[in-house]
Amino acid sequence: MVDRITPATTDTIRVSSADPMAVPTEAFREWVLEDNFAAPRPNWPDVQFVQDVRPHELRKLRILNGAHSFLAYAGLAQGYSYVHEAIADPYLRRRTKQLMMEAGATLPSDMRDQVPDYANALLARFGNVELAHRLDQIAMAGSQKLPYRFLETLRAGRGPIVAEAVRSWMEFCRVQTDQGRALNDPKALDIARAVRSKNPKIALLEVIGGADLAALILG
């Protein structure tokens, strides 16, 4: 499991760097590997070796990635362009923290004590102006991301803010479709058809495999 926020590169970075493959990134980095080597364990002092990497993957998917997606859809709806702008909004910051705590409650029990500190650290990381992490980049391919970032969380435990995040994606899809903007999503055509259907919310849930959660998400 690798955790390091890395926005898409820009023309400015390409021009200013001698490295043609340069990308922006943050100072923070976390690398977790399962201690399951055929040969002796490598001497990598910055790597965390664990028996099971899955809980760390869940923490990243449900808390970091989930919060990013929520900020993307809710932030774009408020007119923001970047993560640092959206997280500076008091309402979105509060809801994002609530989402993190909801998601954290669904993690394996031995990970839950870490959630408050992890969430607070993420809020600080999201406020990094220098990253200039675009919300529309995070919003791409929502049909592929939501099942892991939100739906699995909801199946693991009730979460009203996580459900709100799914509704934010639905509204994003509706607005983009109504305004004639092409969605950057491998299921863009299915999403557009769902938005124009007689029951768009249920149809959108069907696109992402979440129809079983309709009562929880839609209320």
What are these regions (language model features)?
Residues 1-219:
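Substrate/ligand-engaging "lid" and interaction regions
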